[in-house]
Amino acid sequence: MGEDGRVFLRGLTSEAYGLDELRRRQRGAPRVIRAGTVTDDASVGHSGDSDRSRTWWMLGPGDEPFRTQTLQVHFVELSPGGSNKGHGHQNEALFYILEGKGYEIHDGKRYEWERDDLVIVHNDSVHRHYNLDPERRALALVMKPKSAWMYLGLIQQGRGFGADEAAYGPPEDWARLWTKGLDQRKKVVKPADTRWEDTRDGRIRVLTSPERTDVRANAVDIYQQDVAPGSRSVKHWHMADEAVYVMRGRGHSLQWDVEAQIGERYEARVAKEPSRWTFEPGDLVYVPQNTVHQLVNDGSEPLMVLVAQNRLFKLIGYDSVVYLEDAPAAGREVVGTARA
């Protein structure tokens, strides 16, 4: 949250062409955001909450210290039998249901959901969330690339009619601008629509990815990972940053920063020693752009995490993953990679 209101998109200014100092400050921010942290309580510059709903942010462009604006991560809580006000925005948003059961109304259509479903609020959607349980709350973790839409000027959002009747013609179908066939794709991804795979990355369940063309998600790639006690994930390197939500278990994230050596061409210099970031259930682990990293389960129970990336990195030429150390196969046949 900024001093003058909600920060939708953060600016970048410098008197120098090299931005090393900005990068140093960004990477100096803690890379684990503790459970219960509220960086934005949705009291300024928001429109969706009612007296039966609550929204709060863990990761956003207005955070101090600043980490990223490629992804925003927040929670939506609905009281028993409650709903929010509903609103419309141009950016997509993906809701992972942590608790409860309920339904959505998106553009007049109803979509039911329950725990462990992934709900996609598509581009240019007027939507509202409802809790069907009269006794228990519903809770969703929301991952969205809102600032990317803001950068592209896609800022038409809110509620109600905003055009001057005298100056504008009759309503026309906005969906004519969408990619053909998008409205036929899944809006709710259920566990039965996915499968667990043993891959180079470890035990993975992909929810959204460029290859999942049956799902109506265009900008956020999400997978779930299960790491056995005493084991670890893959050690790998990619350009996209990541937000990793710890659903259960505890452990630490090893992160090797990567510096650019810019001579005749770009070359990478990887830190000889990693930084170590411990985490517990409900924490959010942040992995900065261009970082080698690995998760280690040093607890006594399985580690379950939900990992999100902004797909834009893949679309602008950074769709490769460099594998430096495969995850242990734990006696299972490894079938390939299931990276989101």
Outline where the language-model segments fall.
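Asparagine-centered strand-capping/turn motif at beta-strand->loop junctions
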Residues: 130-132, 296-298
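Conserved short histidine dyad/triad with adjacent acidic residue
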Residues: 55-62, 72-89, 221-239, 257-260, ...
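Glycine- and acidic-residue-biased ligand/ion/polar-headgroup-sensing regions
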Residues: 79-80, 91-103, 107, 229, ...
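Catalytic cores of eukaryotic secretory-pathway lumenal/extracellular enzymes that build
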Residues: 113, 125-131, 140
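A short hydrophobic beta-strand segment most commonly corresponding to one strand
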Residues: 70, 94-96, 120, 135-154, ...
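His/acidic/aromatic-lined binding-pocket segments of jelly-roll/cupin-type domains
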Residues: 75-76, 86-88, 92-97, 111, ...
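Short acidic-glycine-tyrosine-enriched beta hairpin
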Residues: 108-124, 258-289
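A short, N-terminal "cap"/entry segment at the start of jelly-roll beta-barrel domains
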Residues: 1-69, 155-219, 234, 323-326, ...
